[in-house]
Curated annotation (Swiss-Prot):
It comes from Borrelia hermsii (strain HS1 / DAH). One of its GO terms (molecular function) is DNA binding. GO terms for biological process: regulation of DNA-templated transcription. This is Probable transcriptional regulatory protein BH0025. GO terms for cellular component: cytosol.
Length: 243
C-alpha cells in the first residue's frame, strides 16, 4: 500500500500551512460555501459539505469561520455561478498532474493555468491523458498517538476496507469511493479521523532525484497559489528529505 500513501504530501502541506494560511482558508471557505449552497447546511444529508468541513478542521480553521461559510452559502442569493474544472497535465520528467479548480470565470482560470504550466516546462494534456493513472478512493487517516493500530485495523477490515497502510504515527484506511461513507461512519463510532476524503490516488509513483523533485514541487506550489485552483493531485514520490 506504500505506493498509494498520500502522507508525505500531507506532511509537506501541513509544514507550509502557516505561511499560506490565509490563502488556504480562502479556498476552504469557498468550498464550504458552495457545498452548502448546492446541498444545504446539514452535513448528514450533504456529503460534500461534510468533506469540506473535515478539510477545514484538519487545517485548523476556527469553528466560527466554518459556521460563517455555511451561512454564507445557504443565504447566497446573488446568482453567482461557480464551475468545477479539471485539467490534466504533464510536468517535467513525466510527472502527471490533475488540477482541480473552482471558478466563476472559466476563461480566466484556463488562461492562468496554461500560463503557469508553460512557464514551468509543463504541458496541458487532453482529457483522459492523465486521469487513467489515478483511481478514486476513500482515504481515512488516524493518529496512532491517539488510538491502537490493531483496533483500527480490526474494525476497518470488518467494515470492508480495501487496504490499510501505516507509517510512523499515522495509519491510513483505503476504501472504494462507493463504500467510503458507510465505512467512515462505522469507524467514526469509535475513532475520530484526522482526514476523511475522496481522493485520487496514483496507481504508481515516479521517483526522481532531489533537484528534479524541487522543480516539480515549485510548479505545484505556483499552481496552488492561484486562487481558482483548489487542489493539485500528482504521482510524484516525495522523498523524506523534501518534507
Amino acid at each position: 500500500m506504500s505506493g498509494h500513501s498520500k502522507w508525505s504530501t500531507i506532511k509537506r502541506k501541513k509544514g507550509a500551512l502557516d505561511a499560506k494560511r490565509n490563502k488556504i482558508f480562502t479556498k476552504l471557505i469557498r468550498e464550504i460555501s458552495i457545498a452548502a449552497k448546492m446541498g444545504g447546511g446539514d452535513i448528514d444529508s450533504n456529503p460534500r459539505l461534510r468533506l469540506a468541513i473535515n478539510k477545514a478542521r484538519v487545517s485548523n480553521m476556527p469553528k466560527d469561520n466554518i459556521e460563517k461559510a455555511i451561512k454564507k452559502g445557504i443565504g447566497d442569493n446573488t446568482g453567482a455561478e461557480y464551475f468545477e474544472l479539471t485539467y490534466e497535465a504533464y510536468a517535467l520528467h513525466g510527472v502527471a498532474l490533475i488540477i482541480k479548480c473552482l471558478t466563476d470565470n472559466k476563461n480566466r482560470t484556463a488562461s492562468e493555468v496554461r500560463s503557469v504550466l508553460s512557464k514551468n516546462g509543463a504541458s496541458l494534456g487532453a482529457p483522459g491523458s492523465v486521469s487513467y493513472m489515478f483511481h478514486k478512493k476513500g482515504l481515512i487517516s488516524y493518529s496512532l498517538d491517539k488510538y491502537p493500530e490493531d483496533e483500527i485495523m480490526e474494525l476497518a477490515l470488518e467494515a470492508g476496507a480495501e487496504d490499510i497502510y501505516s507509517e510512523g504515527s499515522q495509519i491510513e484506511v483505503i476504501t472504494s469511493a462507493e463504500t467510503f461513507e458507510a465505512i467512515s461512519s462505522v469507524l467514526r463510532t469509535k475513532f475520530e479521523e484526522d482526514i476523511a476524503e475522496i481522493a485520487l490516488l496514483p496507481e504508481n509513483k515516479i521517483s526522481l532525484n532531489k533537484e528534479q523533485i524541487d522543480k516539480v514541487l515549485s510548479l505545484i506550489e505556483k499552481l496552488e497559489d492561484f486562487d481558482d485552483v483548489q487542489e493539485v493531485v500528482h504521482n510524484l514520490e516525495i522523498i523524506d528529505e523534501i518534507d
